[in-house]
């Protein structure tokens, strides 16, 4: 299970969807296809896959990217799906009325989906290497400036 306290909160954001009304097995089939891919590639894959589980996962990925850009100031082009997991939720139990006063149980499975996005431009080893050779300056606030051989790149 993904811990609530993350190892690197400066480069990771997450979105959590609870009590989504579908089987965890069916959601895992889609999650396994997007784990480790970039944000833009994930959106294209989810739009083209013909499964019902794609829509809630699409909304969660989109929400996690909105959290990254609004709360942390990350660029969406630099985000990758670092962790994605599906856990089983509580089963909703209902009764379906049948003939002659009988009833059949209906079990509606639910699941909890967690999507964690990571900003690869701020990876620690990459940042240390860039700072060591003077390629990046980090301001106290969210603006970051990089420079290359020919000038300053924002």
UniProtKB/Swiss-Prot annotation:
One of its GO terms (biological process) is translation. Disulfide bonds: none annotated. It comes from the Eukaryota. Belongs to the universal ribosomal protein uL22 family. Part of the 50S ribosomal subunit. The keyword Ribosomal protein applies. HAMAP family: Ribosomal_uL22_B. This is Large ribosomal subunit protein uL22c. This protein binds specifically to 23S rRNA. The gene is rpl22. It comes from Platanus occidentalis. Gene3D superfamilies: Ribosomal protein L22/L17. Pfam families: Ribosomal_L22 (PF00237). GO terms for cellular component: chloroplast; large ribosomal subunit. It is found in: Plastid, Chloroplast. The keyword Calcium does not apply. GO terms for molecular function: rRNA binding; structural constituent of ribosome. Keywords: Chloroplast, Plastid, Ribonucleoprotein, Ribosomal protein, RNA-binding, rRNA-binding.
């Amino acid at each position: 299970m993904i811990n609530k306290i993350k190892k690197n909160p400066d480069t990771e954001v997450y979105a959590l969807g609870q009590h989504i009304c579908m089987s965890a097995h069916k959601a895992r089939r889609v999650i396994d296809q997007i784990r480790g891919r970039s944000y833009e590639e994930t959106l294209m894959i989810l739009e083209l896959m013909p499964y019902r589980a794609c829509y809630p996962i699409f909304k969660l990925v989109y929400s996690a990217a909105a959290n990254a850009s609004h709360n942390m100031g990350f660029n969406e082009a630099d985000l990758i799906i670092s962790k994605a997991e599906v856990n089983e939720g509580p089963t909703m139990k209902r009764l379906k009325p049948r003939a002659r006063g009988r009833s059949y149980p209906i079990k509606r499975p639910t699941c909890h989906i967690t999507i964690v996005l990571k900003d690869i431009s701020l990876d620690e080893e990459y940042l240390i290497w860039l700072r060591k050779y003077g390629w990046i300056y980090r301001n106290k606030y969210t603006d970051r400036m990089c420079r290359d051989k020919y000038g300053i790149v924002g």
